[in-house]
Amino acid sequence: ERVFRGIKMETKQQFLEEINKVKGSKRDYLNKLFQYVLEAVIRAAVHKNVKKDEFIIRAGEPCDTVYIILKGDVAGVDYQKLGKVYYFMDFAKMYIVGDFEIFSEDTNYNVSICASKDSELLAIPASIYWKWIKHDENALLLRIKNIMTILTSEKASDRKYMFMSCKSVL
């Protein structure tokens, strides 16, 4: 697993203070999600600053870390054959990245994600996150609801473009 430079979380209070810096519904969601978080998750979490255009996750690399997005924005990116970067999705509604693969039991990340502006994250080792969330009914239900909302929205968007004429897409 990766080793991160950053501020290591020592107490639940410190962990929740980081989450409470977040604004609005995102803060409410994260507070509910981590209401019964285990000490092991807190002690393993590291606060990390990420610069704009820095990769957080790279497709094909081992799925070893889950990231809580505290501040900033992230986007899914793909490299085309000519070396151009294609931004395919803004993850503004995603508060956590890196756990879809855990739920689907993939060993490697399926997408590359980079910061679309300077961002702050909490990095949690995937194995510790998984041990916690699969035994915390509250967190598991909240996370599954969020994942299903995202997937449903993506599929609706895919269908919209699938039935457009080439002229309309351009």
Residue positions per predicted region:
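Hydrophobic residues at beta-strand termini and immediately following loops
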Residues: 48-50, 91, 124
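A short hydrophobic beta-strand segment most commonly corresponding to one strand
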Residues: 119-128
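Phosphate-/nucleic-acid-contacting segments
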Residues: 1-7, 164, 169-170
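Short, surface-exposed helix-loop/turn micro-motifs enriched in polar/charged residues
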Residues: 86-88, 121, 162
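Cyclic nucleotide-binding regulatory domains
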Residues: 54-117
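A small-molecule sensor/coupling module
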Residues: 108-110, 127-169
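Cyclic nucleotide-binding regulatory module and flanking cytosolic helices
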Residues: 4-52, 101-103
